[in-house]
């Protein structure tokens, strides 16, 4: 009885640690690699946002995506 409880507790602990690691990596990939692009008009047009994002990322040769929320947000991936 005691061994099965310890085994169950060990497996549960490993599962929680691995789960937190996977969720942390996903958040780190999206959250830290996004930045805002401001336009003179103050309005975000999706096509202009995508073009501006690709222009900003052209020099370091990164792949990214621009999308509109309230402002143009550019996220890139390595």
From Swiss-Prot:
Signal peptide feature range: 1-24
Compartment(s) where it occurs, according to its Swiss-Prot or TrEMBL record: Secreted
Main location, first listed in the record: secreted
Keyword Signal found: yes
One GO CC term, this protein: extracellular region
Record's keyword terms, sorted: Antimicrobial, Disulfide bond, Fungicide, Plant defense, Secreted, Signal
GO biological process per UniProt: defense response to fungus; killing of cells of another organism
Disulphide bridges, residue numbers: 34-75, 44-68, 49-72, 53-74
Record's keyword annotation contains Transferase: no
Similarity-based family: Belongs to the DEFL family.
Protein name listed in UniProt: Putative defensin-like protein 133
Organism listed in the record: Arabidopsis thaliana (Mouse-ear cress)
Gene: LCR33
